[in-house]
A protein has these predicted regions:
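Extracytoplasmic beta-strand/coil segments of soluble accessory domains associated
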Residues: 13, 30-73
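Transmembrane beta-barrel wall of Gram-negative outer-membrane proteins
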Residues: 123-125, 130-161, 169-207, 235-240, ...
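Gram-negative outer-membrane beta-barrel transporters
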Residues: 296, 302-306, 310-312, 381-384, ...
Length: 705
């Protein structure tokens, strides 16, 4: 693992090579948590859940704080962030706002993933694995180089798991599932100054999840997972990225074209109780297209220049029906309606009742979005000093057409069943746009010993729409119409504004030993955030959640990383501290200024030792023991800071053997079976927690031909 790479003088980053990923059995971006200082992606929910927190800031739903690029192509929907990492050459995690080069939704950084190249590696790779929870993992790939200028590869993988958490109401595990993927890559060098690189991939997910257990705040006890409707997540994705580069004497022109299709379906028992409250679905089909043109000139005397244009278009068609059942009808609708009915009609001789024991609030949305950006970054070198300045001008527009509707039949008298039909409809459209100026400035001083730097960068997170609020809006409209007191409702609360931040850094990347065996990285940072986007639950027995803009918040802290090679030993260690609080946030019912930001850990720790055990070559070419420990905490679960997860640490280990074309590994995670929570939320007045995976282990067999 490298603690910095690339233009290390300008930002803080961590890179993991293929050998790091495979020897440590890292198969998902979620396992980067704490390996990268102040980076945390909790494992809960399903593969749809990609909540990432960096330096105290993050997002549970909608827009991410971290962008993701695979072979240079941006991933436009964070529902696709959690996928199987197979045949990955390296991963780079950049921390801090990356607005100039990457634009929207990179206020916390960017994750750059690079797959294996058929021009650099040729052969066949096969992996067979079996582990805890009856988990099976199969991987197969072929890399070929038909000439010095053309290479191609094909790779597939399949995973299965029975799951780790049992739903005691349904009598079976709730988080098992299957996923598979296919990747095709072609690289062509038609001439010395032209390259063409195309990657086509498809993925499929069919799984459960949402192992949420009810928490009793009075007894502080966590009940077993028990809800009566099955939860599931299905996802089909197609992605294609085409990168064409033209090389000139002093410059490079790059064109990157990306297309992505996401078709996913989520089904939830949204009350997560063994009661017939309500369930919901979310079905979406999203197409996205991106195009970027970049000119990079590095040999202009003391100057260097990078500039380009970027554009994107997304079209999302979504349905989010909410299925109310008998207990939910009685307690969430009729109870409130009858209380209001008695208030408006004195005497108490009337009572509302529904003929249906269940009904559906249908919510359909069409959400197109497009954006365009111009960016430039220039630098100059003055001896040991380097100065860089950049600016990105970005505009984006998004609209939402909504159609919410429900039909029920009701009566109003206790004794006489006078049937009435109520058709409630809420239709309309909203739009939001933003024009952002994203500057950056950095100064670095370096030599053979490393460098020190100072930087200031601005980033922004796009605004959007609270689609999950529409069932609540229609429910309130329905209650008003039932009691003869219709209310004027609008969709203004469904729009949230962009989030902006400035990241200021002082840092150093040092290699004090002449042999390069010691790398040290240190960073001090301060983040000033305006209009922070927070996921909140409306007051009362709400069925939805919403994104809200807080007034202002900040985070300051430190990041440290060390890598040391000593003979057959490799030591890696990292530490992150983020002191993140609200400066201004009046929620209406409480002034939360000074409270810690929720869901992000205050500290992260990591330590890993790899020991290449000396053995006769007749036994093994490689025999490596890896022992790692990651620590996270404290994490506050709400804005009031009344609930929190104390600090916890997870121990992992692996033993890797390779001889010729063959290899095997034994691995284990959470070896001490630590009990900890990864997520908390409230639903219709109830508290729930998701727990971390228990001790799990497995064995892998590898063949490389």
């Amino acid at each position: 693992m490298k603690i910095s790479d690339g233009d290390a003088g300008e930002y803080s980053s961590t890179s993991l090579r293929r050998v790091d990923l495979e020897n440590r059995h890292i198969t998902s971006v979620k396992e980067f948590s704490a390996l990268t200082p102040n980076f945390y992606q909790p494992d809960y929910g399903s593969r749809m859940t990609s909540s990432i927190y960096v330096r105290g800031f993050g997002s549970r739903i909608d827009q991410p704080v971290v962008g993701m690029n695979i072979d240079g192509v941006p991933v436009m929907n964070k529902n696709s962030y959690d996928f199987e990492l197979f045949d990955i050459d390296r991963v780079q995690v950049m921390r801090g706002a990356q607005g100039v080069l990457f634009g929207r939704n990179t206020t916390g950084g960017a994750i750059n993933i690079y797959t294996m190249s058929p021009l650099d590696f040729q052969g066949k790779r096969l992996t067979l694995e079996y582990g805890s929870a009856n988990s099976v993992r199969l991987k197969a790939s072929h890399y070929a180089k038909t000439s010095e200028t053309f290479g191609w590869s094909v790779g597939v993988h399949y995973n299965h798991s029975d799951g780790y958490f049992r739903n005691y109401e349904l009598g079976k595990n709730c988080d098992g599932g299957d996923n598979a993927a296919l990747r095709l890559r072609m690289q062509w060098l038609p001439s010395e100054n032209l390259s063409v690189d195309n990657t086509l991939s498809a993925g499929y997910v069919d799984e459960g999840g949402w192992a949420y257990a009810h928490y009793n705040p009075e007894t502080r006890e966590l009940a077993p997972v028990a809800y009566n409707d099955e939860c599931s997540y299905n996802r089909f994705t197609i992605s294609d990225g085409l990168v064409v580069k033209r090389y000139f004497d002093n410059a490079t022109l790059s064109s990157t074209t990306g297309y992505q299709y996401v078709d996913d379906r989520m089904e939830l028992d949204n009350d997560f109780l063994p009661l017939d409250y309500f369930s919901m679905g979310q079905y979406q089909k999203e197409h996205s297209l991106t195009q970027e043109l970049v000119v990079k000139a590095d040999d202009l005397g003391i100057f260097n220049l990078l500039g380009g244009v970027f554009g994107f278009f997304k079209h999302n068609r979504m349905s989010a029906p909410v299925h109310f059942k008998q207990f939910g009808i009685d307690n969430l609708i009729l109870k409130n309606a009858n209380e209001e009915y008695y208030y408006y009609l004195s005497g108490g001789d009337r009572k509302l009742s529904f003929e249906e024991d269940n009904f559906v609030i249908a919510d359909d949305f069409v959400i197109p979005a497009f954006g365009a950006a111009l960016f430039v970054q220039g630098g100059a070198s003055f001896g040991s000093f380097d100065v860089k300045a950049g600016l990105r001008v970005e505009y984006e527009y998004s609209s939402m057409s909504y159609d919410s509707r429900a039909t029920v039949h009701y009566s109003t008298y206790k004794d006489l069943r006078d049937s009435n039909e109520l058709n409630t409809v809420f239709k309309g459209s909203r739009a939001v746009d933003a024009l952002e100026l994203l500057p950056s400035l950095s100064v670095s001083y370096g030599g053979n010993w490393g460098n020190v730097y100072a930087s200031a960068r601005k980033g922004f997170k796009a605004g959007g729409f609270n689609t999950q609020l529409f069932s609540d809006i229609l429910k309130q409209q329905m209650i008003g119409e039932l009691i003869g007191n219709p209310q004027d409702v609008d969709a203004s609360s469904t729009v949230y504004e962009p989030e902006e931040n400035w990241t200021y850094e002082l840092g150093a990347h040092l290699s004090p030993l002449s042999n390069g065996n010691l790398d040290i990285s240190a960073t001090l940072f301060y983040i000033d955030c305006r209009n922070q986007q927070l996921t909140v639950f409306p007051d009362g027995e709400s069925t939805g959640r919403m994104m809200s803009n807080a007034g202002r918040s900040f985070s300051n802290g430190v990041e440290l990383g060390v890598r040391y090679l000593l003979g057959d030993f490799t030591f890696d260690a990292g530490f992150g501290y983020a002191h993140a609080r609200f400066i201004e946030y009046n929620r209406g019912d409480a002034d939360l200024a000074g409270k810690f930001l929720p869901y992000a850990p205050r500290e992260t720790y990591s330590a890993n030792v790899a020991y290449r055990i000396p053995v006769p070559r007749s036994f093994a070419n490689i025999f490596v023991l890896n022992v790692g420990w990651n620590g996270v905490g404290r994490i506050y679960w709400n804005e009031e800071n009344t609930l929190s997860q104390p600090f916890y640490g997870l121990l992992s280990a692996s033993l890797v053997w390779e001889k010729g074309h063959w290899g095997a590994s034994l691995w284990g995670k959470n070896l001490l079976d630590e009990k900890y929570n990864t997520f908390y939320f409230r639903s219709i007045g109830n508290d729930f927690f998701a727990q971390g995976k228990p001790l799990h282990f497995g064995v892998s067999l590898h063949v490389n031909l």
